[in-house]
Amino acid sequence: MRIALGIEYDGNGYFGWQRQAEVDSVQAQLERALSIVANEPIGVFCAGRTDAGVHATGQVVHFETQAIRNEGAWTLGVNANLPDNIAVRWVKEVDDSFHARFSATARRYRYVIYNHSFRPGILRHGVSHYHGDIDADRMHQAAQALLGEQDFTSFRAVQCQSKTPFRNVHCVNVTRQGMYVIVDIAANAFLHHMVRNIVGSLLEIGLGNQPLTWMGDLLALKDRNQAAATAKPHGLYLVDVTYPEQYQLPKLALGPLFMLD
């Protein structure tokens, strides 16, 4: 039996999604909880591997099991065995053609900037704090240069293992909600650190340190050293993964927090 899960997690305190020896990860905690409920060893496959400190409201995973449980038993049982900062949002049995990573047609991330003179307290691990006068409209205008299938070498991490730097950005929007600036971006897939590197450069434009044309210039240069520093991980959320309609996976509010879909 193949089962898909929708999960959310606070990435603070974890060394990213992927299971690693001697450090804690979201994958390790989820597999431990699933194995307890299934009463057999469980390994999971995810839609996108998030880095240390990065969060998710819409991560999707799948796993194989011989255990027979109803959806309520999976949800309640797994959540009872997970840490408080990881939770299953939905469960669905899927056919064997479904793969959390390879069946996905798009991923969507939101990066939340707390734009205020003083640092936050309660949300300190859920937003990235940047002071200064950030012009969200200017960031949005500049970000449109990223649309379409392009070479994102200037925005990939040095240690990125992808065979190709080409990705297809479907949409990107930058908006302001009070003291929060939100960068919302969807693509067929993302390179390692791609979203955070894009946000770092957009911030330079929003602060008036670079011209509106800079994102296009960076794409043309194909040189990571020419772009801005990588934005901090705390404000980044994987909020949605798109799959073909045939799988009929549940659709819930994207989040995080108060944000509208």
Curated annotation (Swiss-Prot):
SUPFAM superfamilies: Pseudouridine synthase (SSF55120). It catalyses: uridine(38/39/40) in tRNA = pseudouridine(38/39/40) in tRNA. One of its GO terms (molecular function) is RNA binding. Its EC number is 5.4.99.12. It holds the Pfam family PseudoU_synth_1. Substrate binds at Y109. The active site is at D51. Keywords: Isomerase, tRNA processing. InterPro entries: PsdUridine_synth_cat_dom_sf, PsdUridine_synth_TruA, PsdUridine_synth_TruA_a/b_dom, PsdUridine_synth_TruA_C, TruA/RsuA/RluB/E/F_N. One of its GO terms (biological process) is tRNA pseudouridine synthesis. HAMAP family: TruA (MF_00171). Formation of pseudouridine at positions 38, 39 and 40 in the anticodon stem and loop of transfer RNAs. PANTHER family: PSEUDOURIDYLATE SYNTHASE, TRNA PSEUDOURIDINE SYNTHASE-LIKE 1. Homodimer. Belongs to the tRNA pseudouridine synthase TruA family. This is tRNA pseudouridine synthase A. It comes from Shewanella baltica (strain OS155 / ATCC BAA-1091). The lineage of its organism: Bacteria, Pseudomonadati, Pseudomonadota, Gammaproteobacteria, Alteromonadales.
